[in-house]
């Protein structure tokens, strides 16, 4: 028998739900060691761009599109055509869009004011007191958070064992900075706060007169004012829920921020009460897009249609015939856009080389321990839990493991001596000359970062034969690689070899959780070279020839060098194949570096590209995924020989082999979602760098080992550094939402979307575009939302910019 809740209990439940919704409106950020791209609009994917723009403008002053001038320049240059503008205009809400095409163009030529967030109580108090309370809160909160969240950087670690709120309370009751600034009695105010974060939030909401309708918006704003610290707490919640648990940290941070608001209200209420009443009411008003925001969304849509038109023209060009006989080499790369340049170069070196694209973790979601390490590296997409465990080498490398551990302990002891409070002064005097050689080699870029050189990884525990066979079959079918195997098949993971770069993991493989991809590739090569596994695959219709050898490789995206792990599977019969592959890879690397040099600042030729990763002063060792704008899942023949400029994710997929459309479902729910996170992180860091970007690399300091701050402290900066999206003179990334192109029946695509609401929301609300390719690989159908499709007009390959032949 259930009992009705008391009004107070019901109110508390509603408040708790509002706090939870505010927490989920915040995107997570991963620590630097395993940094991956995250969609900064993750909490707004249930809304359209214009509606999300209204919400984010209210709580953080965020613009969700580029300034109007950016669009106007492209209209004037003819990049965005009248057809693009008209089609985007027709797709917008009738009651909010400009009256006609002329009005839309006039709007593009006019500036709009930068959005301003509703003021917090800290902002209002700053206005009447002259004290920068928002800045002081950010500084004091950041000083505490850097210690609390520290992952080993601090020599004197903060005490652990308490929740975030209790830990902050213990520190802040001894911090007199707020009182010196004029907030008298703040330490006492903190000390007498309720024990639970939820009770603190409830008390603050009551004292501030916050109505239920205003809570979601106001709580969201409070977390946004904490910058990357709130995002890191959201990461803790993400990880806990992925493991089947929960985490209270982000709620604790909301309570901390509200204690500041509450204290400032008690201090300045007589002077700010009228303005606060107006602000509170505004927080309670429904979120709605404005005509200006709809106009901005139309211009954004038009820019994307222009890019889609260019892509359609590229895909409409006559296809190159598939390799008729056995390929001279097959090389599978990650779908990462950087692989597109190298794959095209490799195919041009020898047209009988077949390249494939697949998610860089190669279907093996493993928690891996490197040599001499007890740390589990989650080398898998962050959407997944590890299904396997692996380690570097077996019992035969035990002595090497012990030796490496001794070296690591000695290095840590040396580091503690070097940085300790007392010995650091003597250290410089006593050992400074020893570092002359290192300083010279580092300054001249003569010493690269150590490359991955662990023994071949092994599954631990090992899988039985049936599980190994099932895993191999699943991966090969997902790769659409079930026949016509070459003598040598290379499985190339990718990584980046850079120095002096806190964001180095962001250059690694996102599908491998921010680590390089050689471990997964080496595990798969071992699986596919297993003769018992091959025998088990034959009844399943996958016959791998006895003379086929699988080898793992690592593609260094900074230098375009390819390292083959030939020693993992020695084969005298394949020495010529391996030598020839190395020659082809070297030639392709030279071509790829030459192409990339055209985009990189101060890269005069391909030779200078290879040195950038070793330069301690280089803020742009490579462009990583800047410029990404398309995802194509189709047979490679649809794109072979056509330059996509390193801006497209390429996933091999043959729907005719996918009888149950299980692979299609996997592509839409995993690689497409990961690619959307990447694309939208670049988008957010470009259109709103002050909120969704990491700031200026030249000002970065690593804090807590988890992230960066600009200068000496303050808010953690999440997202991409400015140097990752801008070359100093112009943008290196065009902020366009990703266009996903899939060669598969529309009914099958719609069926997958109908069973995955979160994925469908990305397309229905316009965060991604979706196209179905016809059997010639042309963009034939556009997804119109609500599981509906509209036919695209034929694209003339000879006309790079077709125009509508209608009067407007």
UniProtKB/Swiss-Prot annotation:
Keywords: Cell inner membrane, Cell membrane, Membrane, Metal-binding, Transport, Zinc. GO terms for molecular function: zinc ion binding. It is a peripheral membrane protein. The keyword Membrane applies. Its cofactor is Zn(2+). InterPro entries: DabA. Its main location: membrane. Pfam families: DabA (PF10070). Belongs to the inorganic carbon transporter (TC 9.A.2) DabA family. Part of an energy-coupled inorganic carbon pump. Forms a complex with DabB. This is Probable inorganic carbon transporter subunit DabA.
């Amino acid at each position: 028998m259930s009992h009705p809740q008391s009004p107070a209990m019901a109110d508390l439940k509603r408040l708790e739900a509002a706090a939870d919704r505010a927490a989920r409106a915040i995107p997570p950020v991963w620590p630097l060691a395993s940094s991956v791209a995250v969609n900064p609009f993750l909490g707004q994917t249930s809304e359209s761009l214009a509606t999300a723009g209204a919400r984010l403008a209210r709580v953080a002053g965020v613009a969700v599109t580029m300034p109007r001038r950016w669009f106007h320049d492209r209209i004037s240059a003819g990049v965005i055509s009248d057809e693009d503008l008209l089609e985007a205009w027709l797709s917008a809400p009738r009651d909010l869009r400009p009256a006609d095409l002329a009005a839309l163009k006039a709007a593009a030529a006019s500036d709009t004011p930068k959005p301003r967030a509703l003021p917090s109580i800290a902002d209002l108090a700053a206005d009447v007191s002259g004290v920068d309370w928002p800045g002081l809160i950010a500084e004091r909160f950041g000083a505490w958070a850097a210690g609390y969240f520290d992952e080993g950087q601090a020599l004197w670690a903060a005490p652990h064992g308490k929740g975030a709120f209790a830990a902050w309370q213990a520190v802040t009751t001894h911090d007199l900075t707020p009182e010196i600034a004029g907030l008298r009695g703040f330490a006492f105010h903190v000390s007498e706060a309720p024990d639970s974060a939820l009770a603190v939030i409830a008390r603050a909401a009551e004292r501030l007169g916050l109505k239920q309708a205003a809570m979601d918006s106001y709580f969201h704003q409070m977390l946004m004012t904490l910058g990357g610290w709130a995002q890191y707490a959201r990461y803790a919640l993400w990880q806990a829920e992925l493991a089947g648990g929960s985490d209270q940290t982000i709620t604790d941070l909301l309570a901390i921020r509200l204690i500041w608001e509450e204290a400032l209200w008690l201090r300045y209420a007589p002077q700010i009460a009228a303005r606060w009443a107006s602000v509170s009411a505004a927080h309670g008003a429904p979120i709605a897009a404005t005509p200006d925001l709809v106009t901005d969304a139309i211009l954004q849509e038009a820019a994307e249609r222009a890019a889609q038109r260019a892509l359609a023209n590229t895909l409409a060009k006559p296809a190159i015939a598939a390799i008729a006989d056995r390929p001279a080499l097959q090389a599978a790369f990650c779908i990462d856009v950087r692989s597109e340049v190298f794959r095209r170069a490799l195919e041009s070196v020898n047209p009988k080389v077949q390249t494939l694209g697949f998610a860089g973790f190669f279907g093996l979601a493993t928690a891996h321990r490197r040599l001499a390490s007890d740390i589990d590296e989650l080398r898998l997409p962050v959407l997944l839990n590890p299904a396997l465990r692996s380690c570097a080498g077996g019992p035969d490398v035990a002595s090497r493991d012990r030796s490496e551990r001794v070296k690591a302990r000695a290095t840590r002891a040396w580091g503690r001596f070097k940085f300790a409070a007392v010995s650091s002064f003597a250290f410089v005097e006593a050992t400074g000359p020893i570092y002359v050689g290192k300083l010279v080699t580092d300054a001249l870029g003569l010493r690269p970062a150590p490359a991955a050189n662990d023994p071949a990884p092994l599954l631990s525990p090992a899988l039985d034969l049936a599980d190994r066979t099932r895993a191999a079959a699943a991966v090969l079918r997902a790769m659409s690689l079930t026949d016509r195997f070459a003598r040598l098949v290379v499985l190339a993971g990718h990584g980046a070899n850079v120095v002096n770069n806190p964001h180095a993991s962001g250059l690694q493989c996102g599908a491998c959780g921010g680590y390089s991809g050689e471990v997964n590739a080496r595990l798969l090569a071992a699986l596919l070279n297993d003769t018992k596994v091959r025998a088990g695959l034959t009844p399943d219709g996958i016959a791998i020839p006895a003379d086929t050898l699988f080898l793992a490789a690592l593609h260094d995206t900074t230098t375009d060098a390819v390292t083959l792990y030939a020693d993992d599977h020695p084969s005298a019969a394949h020495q010529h194949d391996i030598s020839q592959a190395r020659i082809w890879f070297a030639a392709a690397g030279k071509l790829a570096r030459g192409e990339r040099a055209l985009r990189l600042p101060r890269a005069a030729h391909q030779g200078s590209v290879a040195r950038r990763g070793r330069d301690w002063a280089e803020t742009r060792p490579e462009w990583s995924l800047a410029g990404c704008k398309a995802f194509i899942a189709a047979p490679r023949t649809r794109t072979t020989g056509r330059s996509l400029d390193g801006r497209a994710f390429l996933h091999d997929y043959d729907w005719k082999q996918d009888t149950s459309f299980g692979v299609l479902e996997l592509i839409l729910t995993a690689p497409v979602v990961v690619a959307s996170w990447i694309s939208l992180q670049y988008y957010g860091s470009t259109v709103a760098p002050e909120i969704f970007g990491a700031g200026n690399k030249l000002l970065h300091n690593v804090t807590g080992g988890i992230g960066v701050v600009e200068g000496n402290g303050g808010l953690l900066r999440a997202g991409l550094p400015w140097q990752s999206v801008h070359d100093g003179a112009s943008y290196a990334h065009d902020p366009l939402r990703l266009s996903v192109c899939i060669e598969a029946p529309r009914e099958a695509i719609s069926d997958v979307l109908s069973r995955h609401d979160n994925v469908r929301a990305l397309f229905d609300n316009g965060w991604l575009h979706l196209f179905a390719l016809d059997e010639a690989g042309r963009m034939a159908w556009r997804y119109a939302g609500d599981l509906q499709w509209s036919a695209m007009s034929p694209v003339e390959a000879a006309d790079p910019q077709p125009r509508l032949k209608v009067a407007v």
